[in-house]
């Protein structure tokens, strides 16, 4: 074997990572350069990156008409005016302004209802694409590249979490709607902190892990202070200010990375994982007494509850152990070694066990939350009333009668499949129990192999329509959400390839074989992949290639599809998944960016049209409709999870995501703009609504930093009500200011 081949084999993953990073940088450089090329002004010494409005022609004192002037045009001439002056408002495939104003007056309300309904559907779709498809591929890619969990959390998963907000922001900037872009970032953070977190608090009081809470809320507070000092103070951003925002996020990344070294994770991959009300993540494991003490054991376990099981690896349990170096913990090196050896001897699916786990988690999955809630209540009705704060000391026995004999069909978001007939041991839970005693009790019982509970091969219909599984047994609102999600899931299943690899904790000590990414699991459907060979190329050329002869482009796409179908049909087995299957996640990564960008462009086009129709400021639309819409799936998913009895999970990703979105969305955009324009400052038009939102968001964060520690890190309905009041008052103030502005 030559030295070159040995080198490529040894460093292939590093090379792939470098290629992926270069491609990603080039892609965004191209997108950002196009965006700022259209908004940069060479007639002024400063770069008016986000400024937009009516100007006067000094030569003849005539007002330059814009689309917003359509309100001054008679209804009979509004259609012609829209065709002449509103073409720039259409950022997507459809011109919604023309669609509305070229409709007769008697039908404009139904047309407006169609536009609003389409907007709601797009918001749901962009949330599903990010959480259930795009983020899943990112997790698989990180597994293939052997990246540590802490690095994955602040890179790949951060990208997946913030993809709708970041891509929507760039889509708004590209069409000169900077006010909408900044408004979306601040409004989304305000909505998530006040409404999403407040909803979780209202549903079920619980105790929150102090370390993650203080870290994330403190850094988000610092982010808002930077925005107030740099952006809202004088309406401009210099290069050094942009660099400070970027470096501040890097500081957050480093802090997350190094603060994660206080714990050790053990990952157990079990084909017969039994989600008995989520054993590892269950609030039963997080019972606290009323004392002031908040042990590291409780903290670490509760912090692990921040992971949504459907977004972790399929049928993978993570158990978080206490730091060996912590003198307050009695977890000896002997016990550590014993557990380590046990996993290696009994778990044939994982040869990498120990890892440090920290950092931001994947955004909550809307589909997973819906399915998880219905499955959890169906299988364990007796556990619905468990309160995270009021678990009494004593024994908890799981009897076989609590478990129904059912096996879930394969679900794209990775819902774990329950099994039946497993009698869990009688486990004693108390506030004084140590983690190692609990884990030792669990490990004392034998595990089950794949042969004990073979899973049937998934049918094509179950793969194409997973939200309709157990449809008759769901509540009315779950049925409504499932029906609304059917078109989106069907489209993405056909045109966005995804592979959910078992997410094993990464430790550089152990070697990982990529073939372990597809252990004999029934996640392979050749029929589905054959259909994807048709729809994936079609979606790629439709949404990514502009210009040229469309007939030739689609003909080339058809030829490529035929070649892929032929190769897949003759060189793959009907039952056994091919070894290259995990690598389709790279294709899904590219298609995910294309899909989310396309949907974001369409959303921006609709919002701009609504601004013209109702004569609303773009910043108000960004702060309210745009922000709430992009966070809609998060709100629904977190409410479902909290109502299922796991509010810790629902609260997990509330504070980390906005930090990334604001710092990267504003910092990198303004920095690149300044560099491209000879170091000039970026001037940003700041309406009063942006300042009002920023200060109310800061008030919410200060309330959390004061109230939660004083309440011994318990969040309750009083806190949720206060957050709701702040959001209602802040939003109402913005609307009143906007209405009074034109009077």
Swiss-Prot record:
Keywords of the record: Endoplasmic reticulum, Ion transport, Membrane, Transmembrane, Transmembrane helix, Transport
Compartment(s) of residence: Endoplasmic reticulum membrane
Annotated transmembrane regions: 13-33, 109-129, 138-158, 182-202, 213-233, 239-258, 528-548, 551-571, 580-600, 609-629, 649-669, 690-710, 718-738
Source superkingdom: Eukaryota
GO annotation terms (biological process): intracellular calcium ion homeostasis; monoatomic cation transmembrane transport; monoatomic cation transport
Matching InterPro entries: CaCA_antiporter, NaCa_Exmemb, NCX_ion-bd_dom_sf
Coiled-coil parts of chain: none
Annotated GO CC locations: endoplasmic reticulum; endoplasmic reticulum membrane; membrane
Gene Ontology MF terms: monoatomic cation transmembrane transporter activity
Topology in membrane: Multi-pass membrane protein
Chief location of this protein within or outside the cell: endoplasmic reticulum
Assigned protein family: Belongs to the Ca(2+):cation antiporter (CaCA) (TC 2.A.19) family.
Function statement: Putative cation exchanger.
Protein's name according to its UniProt entry: Putative cation exchanger C3A12.06c
Organism: Schizosaccharomyces pombe (strain 972 / ATCC 24843) (Fission yeast)
